[in-house]
Every structure is written in C-alpha cells, then in structure tokens.
Amino acid sequence: MAPTKVGINGFGRIGRIVFRNAIEHDDIDIVAVNDPFIETEYAAYMLKYDSTHGQFKGDIKVLSDGLEVNGKKVKFYTERDPANIPWAESEAYYVVESTGVFTTTEKAKAHLKGGAKKVVISAPSADAPMYVMGVNNETYNGEADVISNASCTTNCLAPLAKVINDEFTIIESLMTTIHSYTATQKTVDGPSAKDWRGGRTAAQNIIPSSTGAAKAVGKVIPELNGKLTGMSMRVPTATVSVVDLTVRIEKAASYDEIKEVIKKAANGPLKGILAYTEDDVVSTDMNGDNHSSIFDAKAGISLNKNFVKLVSWYDNEWGYSRRVLDLLHYISKVDNKQ
C-alpha cells in the first residue's frame, strides 16, 4: 500500500511534532500544511529548531509556495476558514486538525469542502467518535468522516486500563496525571477568569487542574464507563508526563502477577503502544519515546491483592503525535478495503 497522503491544519506544537514524526513514518506522506499565522520562512525555522526535541535532522528548503523537506515538496496554505483550504490540490485526502479550534464534528467537517475525505482531530472532541490505538481502533468501520484521537493522557491510560480490566476486572479507579505544562498556561501570573489557578506561572508551580482524560476512557472502553475518573497536576517540565492509576480489582493478584500481565501485553498485542520497563527511569528518559504508555514496574505499589497503584509514563507531545499518524494510516487501510 502506498503511503497515506496527509494534510495538517495548524502548525503549532502538535502540528509540527506530527510533521516531524511523519518523517520517520514510512506509511505517511505529509503533502500540505495550512496555518494562517505562519509564513513559510518562519515555518521552516520552527520546524528546524525545537527547544524540547532538538534540531531537525533533515534538509529543509523554503519555496515560493511551501517547503521542500528531504527532497519532498510540502504545499503551504494560509486560509483562516477550513472550508477554503484546497486539500484536493495536493491529494491530501486525510487531514490532521491540530489547531485546537475546530474540535467538533460540524466545525471539522469544513475540511471536506476542500477535498478532504477524513479528518482526525488531535484532541478530545465533544461529539466526534474517539479512537485509541490498541484499544478500540478496530471498531472503526469507515462511516465517520470526522474522528478524534482523544487526548495524550487518554492514550496513555486506556491501554493500561484495558490490560488490567481484561485480566482482573476493574471495580473502580482514580487517576492523577502529573502533566507537563502546555501552551495554554502562563509564563508569569496573569488573568484567567475561568481557571484562577491556571493563571499562575507554569514555571514555578504545581497546579491542580481538571482533566476529562479518565472519563474519556469510558468512551473507548464502554465497560469502564462510570468506574474511572481523574485529575491533573500541571508541573514545571517541558514534556513527558506520568499517569498514577489507583485501581481496585475484582480478581485478586499480587503486584508481581500484575506486572507479568502488563509485560506480556507490552511484548504481544500492544507492542509499540504499551512499553514495560524495570529500569530506574526519570521523566527525561522518555523524551521522544514513540509509545503511548511506558509502564514503570518499579514505581507501582500494592496495598493488598485487590488494591494497587500503577505508574505509566508518556511523552505527551511525541508519543501522542505518533499515534495520530498510526490512526490515520489505520483508517486509510480500512477505507481502501471498502
């Protein structure tokens, strides 16, 4: 199968990291990018230099109407309205919607007017079906024009929750994500009328925050609906976050038995999605890791055979962006069979 031709709307944090990931993804070919706020010369600069993930290793040339990256032309558009982006011109029939603005089905569907066939929103959506690779992607049947790749935290949590629930049955669970700061936070204290704590400087504080990531697991694993909720602690790190999952299980098991089940899944059906480590890792060790979830065997604890705390890392930028591309390629394969 030929690589899936993809367009990106929004060349911000996730848009650029999706692009970088695509260079390593043989099944994806980025052919077009749209961003009304970034000129091509600036786009080249932002792609080349990244404070968190380092300098781009490939060749970038600025053209009159786009970029040439590693010898391949990428068309650039500057349309504010998704309906006006001529995706068909570049045969970009699959689009990553990464502006963070057009996250509903109705808004994201505007891409179809320009020739896109399918849109993957790189964020949770209020109404678009959500898919998490390794968890419920096989339920995709090609009918939806707009789908969501859920959130980075849901992508970390859901594979782990699936393994535990499949083997031991989850009765109830609470999650905390210790999450790196993101672009929505403040460099210094500033006004934030809807979230007072969120207006405090990200660089100096641990900031309690809400997250819908745990509840979203109930959408991709229906049997966990109502059994799982969670919160977030925003911390002063640039990338790599960690899920702390405290779970009560029906089938009694020692922590060692639970570890073995997770290890088996990581080396089997969830290989490439879920990883397993017994190393003494810290957050920066996962910078640039492609996995959705890296289970830390040494960090977890159990109170008894029915009550356990599990810890799993994720690069909330890099690993998530890789799953966006994996989902795009997966749905294109399903679509091509129909």
From Swiss-Prot:
Subcellular location: Cytoplasm
Pathway: Carbohydrate degradation; glycolysis; pyruvate from D-glyceraldehyde 3-phosphate: step 1/5
EC number: 1.2.1.12
Binding positions for NAD(+) per the UniProt entry: 13-14, 35, 80, 316
Active site (catalytic residues): 152 (nucleophile)
GO cellular component, one term: cytosol
One of the GO biological process terms: glucose metabolic process
One function term, GO molecular function aspect: NADP binding
Keyword annotations of the record: Cytoplasm, Glycolysis, NAD, Oxidoreductase
Pfam families: Gp_dh_C, Gp_dh_N
SUPFAM superfamilies for this protein: Glyceraldehyde-3-phosphate dehydrogenase-like, C-terminal domain (SSF55347), NAD(P)-binding Rossmann-fold domains (SSF51735)
Binding-site residues, D-glyceraldehyde 3-phosphate: 151-153, 182, 211-212, 234
Keyword presence, NAD: yes
Site (Activates thiol group during catalysis): 179
Catalysed conversion reaction: D-glyceraldehyde 3-phosphate + phosphate + NAD(+) = (2R)-3-phospho-glyceroyl phosphate + NADH + H(+)
Annotated NCBIfam families: GAPDH-I
Family statement drawn from the similarity comment of this UniProt entry: Belongs to the glyceraldehyde-3-phosphate dehydrogenase family.
Subunit architecture: Homotetramer.
Protein's UniProt name: Glyceraldehyde-3-phosphate dehydrogenase
Name of the coding gene: GPD
